Protein backbone atom coordinates (compact mmCIF):
# COMPACT_ATOMS: atom_id res chain seq x y z
CA UNK A 1 0.00 0.00 0.00
CA UNK A 2 2.82 2.37 0.90
CA UNK A 3 6.52 2.21 0.09
CA UNK A 4 7.84 -0.13 2.80
CA UNK A 5 10.45 2.30 4.13
CA UNK A 6 7.81 4.99 4.67
CA UNK A 7 5.69 2.58 6.71
CA UNK A 8 8.64 1.53 8.83
CA UNK A 9 9.49 5.18 9.46
CA UNK A 10 5.99 5.59 10.90
CA UNK A 11 6.25 2.46 12.99
CA UNK A 12 3.53 0.79 10.93
CA UNK A 13 5.43 -1.84 8.98
CA UNK A 14 4.99 -5.61 9.36
CA UNK A 15 7.96 -7.97 9.16
CA UNK A 16 7.74 -10.88 6.74
CA UNK A 17 7.28 -13.33 9.62
CA UNK A 18 5.29 -10.96 11.81
CA UNK A 19 1.65 -10.80 12.86
CA UNK A 20 -0.49 -8.38 10.90
CA UNK A 21 -0.89 -5.27 13.04
CA UNK A 22 -4.24 -4.09 14.30
CA UNK A 23 -6.16 -3.22 17.41
CA UNK A 24 -8.42 -5.81 19.02
CA UNK A 25 -10.84 -6.11 21.90
CA UNK A 26 -11.24 -9.19 24.02
CA UNK A 27 -11.59 -10.67 27.49
CA UNK A 28 -8.71 -11.24 29.91
CA UNK A 29 -8.12 -14.97 30.53
CA UNK A 30 -4.91 -14.59 32.58
CA UNK A 31 -3.27 -11.62 34.25
CA UNK A 32 -0.17 -10.82 36.28
CA UNK A 33 -1.19 -7.17 36.65
CA UNK A 34 -3.17 -5.76 39.54
CA UNK A 35 -4.83 -3.40 37.05
CA UNK A 36 -6.66 -6.18 35.22
CA UNK A 37 -8.68 -9.14 36.44
CA UNK A 38 -9.78 -12.27 34.65
CA UNK A 39 -12.98 -11.45 32.80
CA UNK A 40 -12.18 -7.79 32.20
CA UNK A 41 -12.78 -6.50 28.68
CA UNK A 42 -9.79 -4.72 27.20
CA UNK A 43 -8.58 -3.12 23.99
CA UNK A 44 -4.98 -3.53 22.90
CA UNK A 45 -2.55 -3.93 19.98
CA UNK A 46 -2.96 -7.70 19.63
CA UNK A 47 -2.97 -7.83 15.83
CA UNK A 48 -4.69 -10.42 13.68
CA UNK A 49 -4.76 -13.27 16.20
CA UNK A 50 -7.21 -15.21 18.33
CA UNK A 51 -5.10 -14.75 21.48
CA UNK A 52 -2.53 -12.22 22.55
CA UNK A 53 -0.22 -11.19 25.37
CA UNK A 54 0.40 -7.53 26.05
CA UNK A 55 2.06 -5.35 28.73
CA UNK A 56 -0.53 -3.79 31.01
CA UNK A 57 0.37 -0.16 30.13
CA UNK A 58 -0.62 -0.85 26.51
CA UNK A 59 -4.14 -1.98 27.42
CA UNK A 60 -7.31 0.00 28.00
CA UNK A 61 -10.07 -1.42 30.20
CA UNK A 62 -13.51 -1.18 28.63
CA UNK A 63 -16.91 -0.55 30.20
CA UNK A 64 -19.52 -2.46 28.22
CA UNK A 65 -22.28 -0.54 30.01
CA UNK A 66 -21.30 2.69 28.20
CA UNK A 67 -21.26 1.24 24.70
CA UNK A 68 -20.60 -2.10 22.97
CA UNK A 69 -16.97 -3.12 23.41
CA UNK A 70 -16.54 -3.08 19.63
CA UNK A 71 -16.79 0.71 19.72
CA UNK A 72 -13.29 0.79 21.24
CA UNK A 73 -12.10 0.00 17.71
CA UNK A 74 -14.25 2.62 16.05
CA UNK A 75 -16.21 5.58 17.34
CA UNK A 76 -14.58 5.39 20.80
CA UNK A 77 -11.20 4.27 19.52
CA UNK A 78 -8.47 5.41 17.18
CA UNK A 79 -10.77 6.24 14.21
CA UNK A 80 -13.11 8.35 16.31
CA UNK A 81 -10.16 10.03 18.00
CA UNK A 82 -8.67 10.77 14.58
CA UNK A 83 -11.84 12.51 13.43
CA UNK A 84 -12.20 14.42 16.70
CA UNK A 85 -8.60 15.63 16.76
CA UNK A 86 -8.45 16.59 13.10
CA UNK A 87 -11.73 18.48 13.23
CA UNK A 88 -11.39 20.21 16.60
CA UNK A 89 -7.67 20.97 16.66
CA UNK A 90 -6.78 21.41 12.98
CA UNK A 91 -10.13 22.30 11.42
CA UNK A 92 -10.68 25.13 13.93
CA UNK A 93 -14.43 25.20 13.17
CA UNK A 94 -16.65 28.25 13.41
CA UNK A 95 -20.44 28.21 13.48
CA UNK A 96 -22.02 28.84 10.09
CA UNK A 97 -19.07 27.51 8.07
CA UNK A 98 -19.23 24.74 5.48
CA UNK A 99 -17.33 21.49 5.87
CA UNK A 100 -16.74 18.81 3.25
CA UNK A 101 -15.48 15.34 4.15
CA UNK A 102 -14.86 12.40 1.85
CA UNK A 103 -15.32 8.78 2.96
CA UNK A 104 -18.21 10.29 4.87
CA UNK A 105 -19.67 7.02 6.17
CA UNK A 106 -16.40 5.62 7.52
CA UNK A 107 -15.62 5.86 11.24
CA UNK A 108 -13.43 8.94 10.75
CA UNK A 109 -15.59 10.80 8.24
CA UNK A 110 -18.84 10.11 10.09
CA UNK A 111 -17.32 11.44 13.32
CA UNK A 112 -16.18 14.60 11.53
CA UNK A 113 -19.59 15.17 9.96
CA UNK A 114 -21.49 14.71 13.22
CA UNK A 115 -19.15 16.99 15.13
CA UNK A 116 -19.55 19.61 12.42
CA UNK A 117 -23.33 19.45 12.65
CA UNK A 118 -23.23 19.70 16.44
CA UNK A 119 -20.97 22.76 16.16
CA UNK A 120 -23.36 24.57 13.83
CA UNK A 121 -21.61 23.95 10.51
CA UNK A 122 -23.07 22.70 7.22
CA UNK A 123 -21.75 19.18 6.68
CA UNK A 124 -21.46 17.94 3.10
CA UNK A 125 -20.31 14.37 2.58
CA UNK A 126 -18.72 12.57 -0.34
CA UNK A 127 -18.98 8.79 -0.55
CA UNK A 128 -18.81 5.95 -3.04
CA UNK A 129 -22.26 4.78 -4.04
CA UNK A 130 -25.89 5.76 -3.58
CA UNK A 131 -26.34 3.48 -0.55
CA UNK A 132 -23.45 5.09 1.29
CA UNK A 133 -24.79 8.55 0.50
CA UNK A 134 -28.18 7.54 1.89
CA UNK A 135 -26.46 6.29 5.05
CA UNK A 136 -24.57 9.57 5.38
CA UNK A 137 -27.77 11.60 5.23
CA UNK A 138 -30.24 9.36 7.03
CA UNK A 139 -28.01 7.88 9.74
CA UNK A 140 -25.27 10.45 10.27
CA UNK A 141 -27.19 13.65 9.50
CA UNK A 142 -25.22 15.17 6.62
CA UNK A 143 -27.13 17.88 4.74
CA UNK A 144 -26.09 16.40 1.43
CA UNK A 145 -23.83 13.63 0.17
CA UNK A 146 -22.37 13.33 -3.31
CA UNK A 147 -21.64 9.95 -4.89
CA UNK A 148 -18.19 10.43 -6.40
CA UNK A 149 -18.58 7.30 -8.53
CA UNK A 150 -21.35 9.06 -10.47
CA UNK A 151 -18.92 11.65 -11.85
CA UNK A 152 -16.42 10.79 -14.58
CA UNK A 153 -14.06 13.69 -13.87
CA UNK A 154 -13.07 16.01 -11.05
CA UNK A 155 -14.59 18.85 -13.06
CA UNK A 156 -18.00 17.15 -13.06
CA UNK A 157 -17.77 16.46 -9.34
CA UNK A 158 -16.71 20.06 -8.72
CA UNK A 159 -19.81 21.39 -10.47
CA UNK A 160 -22.08 19.31 -8.24
CA UNK A 161 -20.08 20.24 -5.16
CA UNK A 162 -20.29 23.93 -6.03
CA UNK A 163 -24.08 23.62 -6.11
CA UNK A 164 -24.05 21.90 -2.70
CA UNK A 165 -21.67 24.53 -1.27
CA UNK A 166 -22.90 27.90 -2.63
CA UNK A 167 -20.80 29.78 -0.07
CA UNK A 168 -17.65 27.80 -0.76
CA UNK A 169 -15.81 25.37 1.50
CA UNK A 170 -14.17 26.43 4.76
CA UNK A 171 -12.93 23.04 5.98
CA UNK A 172 -12.07 20.07 3.81
CA UNK A 173 -11.21 16.98 5.85
CA UNK A 174 -8.95 14.97 3.54
CA UNK A 175 -9.30 11.20 3.59
CA UNK A 176 -9.00 10.18 -0.06
CA UNK A 177 -7.12 12.68 -2.31
CA UNK A 178 -7.30 12.03 -6.06
CA UNK A 179 -10.35 13.22 -7.96
CA UNK A 180 -12.08 14.49 -4.83
CA UNK A 181 -9.14 16.69 -3.80
CA UNK A 182 -8.95 18.17 -7.29
CA UNK A 183 -12.68 18.90 -7.17
CA UNK A 184 -12.61 20.59 -3.76
CA UNK A 185 -9.50 22.76 -3.96
CA UNK A 186 -10.86 25.47 -6.29
CA UNK A 187 -13.90 25.83 -4.01
CA UNK A 188 -11.91 26.49 -0.84
CA UNK A 189 -12.56 29.86 0.77
CA UNK A 190 -9.76 32.22 1.73
CA UNK A 191 -8.35 31.12 5.06
CA UNK A 192 -9.71 27.60 4.65
CA UNK A 193 -8.32 24.64 6.59
CA UNK A 194 -7.47 21.17 5.28
CA UNK A 195 -6.57 18.51 7.87
CA UNK A 196 -4.95 15.62 5.98
CA UNK A 197 -5.81 12.27 7.52
CA UNK A 198 -5.44 9.89 4.57
CA UNK A 199 -4.85 9.59 0.82
CA UNK A 200 -6.53 6.27 0.17
CA UNK A 201 -7.25 6.73 -3.54
CA UNK A 202 -3.50 7.03 -4.16
CA UNK A 203 -2.37 4.10 -2.02
CA UNK A 204 -2.76 1.46 -4.74
CA UNK A 205 -2.00 3.71 -7.71
CA UNK A 206 1.72 4.23 -7.22
CA UNK A 207 1.31 7.98 -6.79
CA UNK A 208 2.88 7.83 -3.32
CA UNK A 209 5.84 5.87 -4.60
CA UNK A 210 7.08 8.65 -6.84
CA UNK A 211 4.95 7.94 -9.91
CA UNK A 212 2.18 10.46 -10.57
CA UNK A 213 -1.07 8.87 -11.69
CA UNK A 214 -4.18 10.14 -13.43
CA UNK A 215 -2.97 13.66 -14.07
CA UNK A 216 -2.04 14.35 -10.44
CA UNK A 217 1.34 15.73 -11.49
CA UNK A 218 -0.20 17.95 -14.17
CA UNK A 219 -2.59 19.47 -11.63
CA UNK A 220 0.05 20.08 -8.97
CA UNK A 221 0.78 23.71 -9.99
CA UNK A 222 -2.93 24.54 -9.77
CA UNK A 223 -3.17 22.95 -6.33
CA UNK A 224 -0.20 24.91 -5.06
CA UNK A 225 -1.61 28.10 -6.52
CA UNK A 226 -4.85 27.54 -4.62
CA UNK A 227 -2.88 27.06 -1.41
CA UNK A 228 -1.05 30.34 -1.98
CA UNK A 229 -3.87 32.54 -3.23
CA UNK A 230 -6.47 31.22 -0.77
CA UNK A 231 -4.01 31.36 2.18
CA UNK A 232 -4.95 27.81 3.07
CA UNK A 233 -3.77 26.03 6.20
CA UNK A 234 -2.95 22.41 5.37
CA UNK A 235 -1.94 20.10 8.20
CA UNK A 236 -0.96 16.48 7.80
CA UNK A 237 -1.18 14.51 11.01
CA UNK A 238 -0.47 11.04 12.38
CA UNK A 239 -2.86 10.41 15.24
CA UNK A 240 -0.35 8.35 17.24
CA UNK A 241 1.54 11.61 17.85
CA UNK A 242 -1.37 12.89 19.92
CA UNK A 243 -2.28 10.10 22.38
CA UNK A 244 -1.86 12.55 25.26
CA UNK A 245 -5.26 13.95 24.26
CA UNK A 246 -7.06 10.60 24.08
CA UNK A 247 -8.57 10.90 27.56
CA UNK A 248 -9.92 14.35 26.65
CA UNK A 249 -11.49 12.81 23.55
CA UNK A 250 -13.15 10.05 25.57
CA UNK A 251 -14.42 12.51 28.17
CA UNK A 252 -16.07 14.53 25.40
CA UNK A 253 -17.36 11.78 23.11
CA UNK A 254 -18.20 8.75 25.30
CA UNK A 255 -21.19 10.44 27.02
CA UNK A 256 -22.46 11.62 23.63
CA UNK A 257 -22.25 8.10 22.22
CA UNK A 258 -24.05 6.71 25.28
CA UNK A 259 -26.78 9.34 24.84
CA UNK A 260 -27.17 8.56 21.13
CA UNK A 261 -25.96 12.01 20.11
CA UNK A 262 -22.99 10.56 18.21
CA UNK A 263 -23.96 7.56 16.10
CA UNK A 264 -21.87 4.77 14.60
CA UNK A 265 -22.23 2.00 12.06
CA UNK A 266 -20.30 -1.27 12.01
CA UNK A 267 -19.62 -3.68 9.14
CA UNK A 268 -18.81 -7.02 10.79
CA UNK A 269 -17.13 -9.93 9.00
CA UNK A 270 -17.12 -13.32 10.73
CA UNK A 271 -13.88 -15.30 11.00
CA UNK A 272 -10.21 -14.35 11.09
CA UNK A 273 -9.68 -16.30 7.86
CA UNK A 274 -11.84 -13.69 6.09
CA UNK A 275 -9.80 -10.72 7.32
CA UNK A 276 -7.66 -10.37 4.15
CA UNK A 277 -10.78 -10.27 1.98
CA UNK A 278 -12.35 -7.69 4.30
CA UNK A 279 -9.21 -5.53 4.11
CA UNK A 280 -9.24 -5.69 0.32
CA UNK A 281 -12.91 -4.71 0.36
CA UNK A 282 -12.13 -1.79 2.65
CA UNK A 283 -9.50 -0.47 0.26
CA UNK A 284 -11.94 -0.88 -2.62
CA UNK A 285 -14.66 1.02 -0.75
CA UNK A 286 -16.96 -1.97 -0.26
CA UNK A 287 -17.40 -1.62 3.50
CA UNK A 288 -20.17 0.31 5.25
CA UNK A 289 -19.00 2.07 8.38
CA UNK A 290 -16.26 0.62 10.58
CA UNK A 291 -14.91 -2.67 9.22
CA UNK A 292 -14.53 -5.24 12.00
CA UNK A 293 -13.58 -8.91 12.18
CA UNK A 294 -15.43 -11.03 14.76
CA UNK A 295 -13.77 -14.21 16.03
Residues covered by each model-derived region:
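C-terminal capping/lid region of NAD(P)-dependent oxidoreductase domains
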Residues: 259-268, 276-295
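Short glycine-centered segments of the SAM/dcSAM-binding site in methyltransferase folds
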Residues: 41, 98, 122, 192-193, ...
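A glycine-rich, Thr/Ser-enriched phosphate-binding loop motif common to dinucleotide/cofactor-binding enzymes
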Residues: 64-90, 95, 101-105, 150-151, ...
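Adenosine-nucleotide cofactor-binding segment
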Residues: 117-183, 240
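Glycine-rich beta-strand-centered segment in the early N-terminal region that forms part
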Residues: 2-48
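Glycine-rich phosphate-binding loop and adjacent beta-alpha segment
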Residues: 179-262, 295
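N-terminal Rossmann-fold NAD(P) dinucleotide-binding loop
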Residues: 109-110
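Short, well-ordered loop/turn sites that connect or cap secondary structure elements
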Residues: 35-36, 93, 188
